[in-house]
UniProtKB/Swiss-Prot annotation:
Name the UniProt record assigns to this protein: Ras-related protein Rab-34
Cofactor: Mg(2+)
Lipidation (S-geranylgeranyl cysteine): C257, C258
Motif (Switch 1): 71-89
Binding residue positions for Mg(2+): T66, T84, D107
PANTHER family: RAS-RELATED PROTEIN RAB
GO biological process: antigen processing and presentation; cilium assembly; cytosolic ciliogenesis; Golgi to plasma membrane protein transport; lysosome localization; phagosome maturation; phagosome-lysosome fusion; positive regulation of smoothened signaling pathway
Domain comment as written in the entry: Switch 1, switch 2 and the interswitch regions are characteristic of Rab GTPases and mediate the interactions with Rab downstream effectors. The switch regions undergo conformational changes upon nucleotide binding which drives interaction with specific sets of effector proteins, with most effectors only binding to GTP-bound Rab.
GO function terms (MF aspect): GTP binding; GTP-dependent protein binding; GTPase activity; small GTPase binding
């Protein structure tokens, strides 16, 4: 019995979504990794289609974390601000290169008094989205601490990082250009991919989350292929080891009959 919701038609990815800015991207490839494409075509993705990948969204109070998630998951925008208490999450189902894939988006509180509660949910993230307000330079400066807190509970070498500027609709072109310059530098220092979005208008929101889903999926498949490759190598070593032992055992046996 399949208890998972079916994949919506607008959540199907047949190609790799492109980055916003090449100078601050996790990678600039135009297509999925060839090994990933091949594995999907041959249905060698292991347990990837059954896993739920955890994505945490962190950042200062009122930078627009909840609005960002709601715009993508529910296609809504609520102008009446309500602070997140503790944590909340949404589940999104995708189909990437014909393989089902699920993201669990964790919306964490930005208030200091809930920080301790929220941080307990950071562990096990495969992607971290650090959100700041494009109209508030202090919120950009604070992203470094938010990232440091999140990485205390995760392996920095195995998590994907995204730096997202929100409320782009409130910036003039001149204001945005200045903030983007600083944000790109921060993203490069973090080794994060940079995006700028507007939850009010929906600008870049869909493209951003598709990019998150695609890169997280790609990382999962590559990890699965590495595991399966290691298992195959291990099996060969064990077989060869057993063969050697059998040979040594046989050579030590005395003949049971006379020549």
């Amino acid at each position: 019995m399949n208890i998972l919701a079916p994949v919506r038609r607008d959540r199907v990815l047949a190609e790799l979504p492109q980055c916003l800015r090449k100078e601050a991207a996790l990678h600039g490839h135009k297509d999925f990794h060839p090994r990933v494409t091949c594995a999907c075509q041959e249905h060698r993705t292991g347990t990837v289609g059954f896993k739920i990948s955890k994505v945490i969204v962190v950042g200062d109070l009122s930078v627009g974390k909840t609005c960002l998630i709601n715009r993508f998951c529910k296609d809504t925008f609520d102008k009446n601000y309500k602070a997140t208490i503790g944590v909340d999450f949404e589940m999104e189902r995708f189909e990437v290169l014909g393989i089902p894939f699920s993201l669990q988006l964790w919306d964490t509180a930005g208030q200091e008094r809930f920080k301790c509660i929220a941080s307990t949910y950071y562990r096990g993230a495969q992607a971290i989205i650090i959100v700041f307000n494009l109209n508030d330079v202090a919120s950009l400066e604070h992203t470094k601490q938010w990232l440091a807190d999140a990485l205390k509970e995760n392996d920095p070498s195995s998590v994907l990082l995204f730096l997202v500027g929100s409320k782009k609709d409130l910036s003039t072109p001149a204001q945005y250009a200045l903030m983007e310059k600083d944000a790109l530098q921060v993203a490069q220092e973090m080794k994060a991919e940079y995006w700028a979005v507007s939850s009010l208008t929906g600008e870049n929101v869909r493209e951003f989350f598709f990019r998150v889903a695609a890169l997280t999926f790609e990382a999962n498949v590559l990890a699965e292929l590495e595991k399966s490759g290691a298992r195959r190598i291990g099996d060969v070593v064990r077989i060869n080891s057993d063969d050697s032992n059998l040979y040594l055992t046989a050579s030590k046996k005395k003949p049971t009959c006379c020549p």
